[in-house]
Amino acid sequence: MTVELPSTQRALVFDTWNGPLEVRQVPVPSPADDEILVKIEYSGICHSDLHVWLGDLKDMSVCPLVGGHEGAGSVVQIGKNVTGWQLGDKAGVKLMNFNCLNCEFCKKGHEPLCHHIQNYGFDRSGTFQEYLTIRGVDAAKINKDTNLAAAAPILCAGVTVYKALKESNVAPGQIIVLTGAGGGLGSLAIQYACAMGMRVVAMDHGSKEAHCKGLGAEWFVDAFETPDIVSHITKLTEGGPHGVINFAVARKPMEQAVEYVRKRGTVVFVGLPKDSKVTFDTTPFIFNAITIKGSIVGSRLDVDEAMEFVTRGIVKVPLELVKLEDVPAVYQRMLDGKINSRAVVDFSL
């Protein structure tokens, strides 16, 4: 089986941070001996793509750049040293790749912490293009029965929330608060949390209450209209939730979480406020034996586990399919807080 390939492809490129986003023709790459070439059929649009383009993550990214890091498609070429892949297989291109597989972090399953990591859509051109090479050992295998459009966001958003839920150490039957619950990450987190047996308190703007409860949240807290968030959640959960995951990109909910989480509870930070700084009183942190930790995407195994929920239909990805040319408009809606679903580029449009 051979696949005839074009010499050029469409890609969404920016030359300077916060500069024009332009669809251009760029060369189709050839895979190295240890790589496969994936025809990208769908690419999720992540908030971090927006922040890279805006220049908020200059220390981690380069220009010019093709953004994107949630790509799903089909294998169309295979390097001579690659094993385990066949032409036509469904493959995923996730954010963090090129880890060494030999350091202490890789050996313990903490692959995203490897010092050799390279990030698609950050320091390597990413999935907002029709063809992309990736090492065979890095590409995620996607079940042939999995909806590829739904699979794309799982490669970053899905595994991010799934791993954060695992990091929260909240057990089945216990309560977890999800801030920013009505957004793209939160919408997935509600479903994963419910599937894992957790009881969910969703926190976001009041306009997103029906959306969050429709996904399985047991309670909803209006983050903008509730007079005293800390006392309200403490009372609602009879002593505080066992865990909190902060998806909101603001300082206040991060600081409040330390005050209302249950004794010996865990607060997980995922959302990045613009200035990346928070301030909180160390007294409750110490005297209540609270654990505060960060969480960033997940390992190969985490990706496989997160994808299985989607393949089995347990987690449903709220999708909005858009054209490649629509990415700038999606970024603006993200800035305006008007995204309830996962926007995904459909390259057939």
From Swiss-Prot:
One biological process term in Gene Ontology: defense response to Gram-positive bacterium
EC number: 1.1.1.1
Family annotation (InterPro entries): ADH-like_C, ADH-like_N, ADH_Zn_CS, GroES-like_sf, NAD(P)-bd_dom_sf, PKS_ER
Swiss-Prot/TrEMBL cofactor(s): Zn(2+)
Gene3D superfamilies (alphabetical): Medium-chain alcohol dehydrogenases, catalytic domain (3.90.180.10), NAD(P)-binding Rossmann-like Domain (3.40.50.720)
Residues annotated for Zn(2+) 1 binding in this entry: C46, H69, C156
Catalysed reactions listed for this entry: a primary alcohol + NAD(+) = an aldehyde + NADH + H(+); a secondary alcohol + NAD(+) = a ketone + NADH + H(+)
Details of cofactor binding: Binds 2 Zn(2+) ions per subunit.
Residues of the signal peptide: none
GO CC aspect terms: cytoplasm
Name of a matching Pfam family: ADH_zinc_N
SUPFAM superfamilies: GroES-like (SSF50129), NAD(P)-binding Rossmann-fold domains (SSF51735)
Binding site for Zn(2+) 2: C100, C103, C106, C114
The keyword NAD appears for this protein: yes
One GO MF term attached to the UniProt entry: alcohol dehydrogenase (NAD+) activity
Oligomeric form and interacting partners: Homotetramer.
The name this protein goes by in its record: Alcohol dehydrogenase 1
Species the sequence originates in: Caenorhabditis elegans
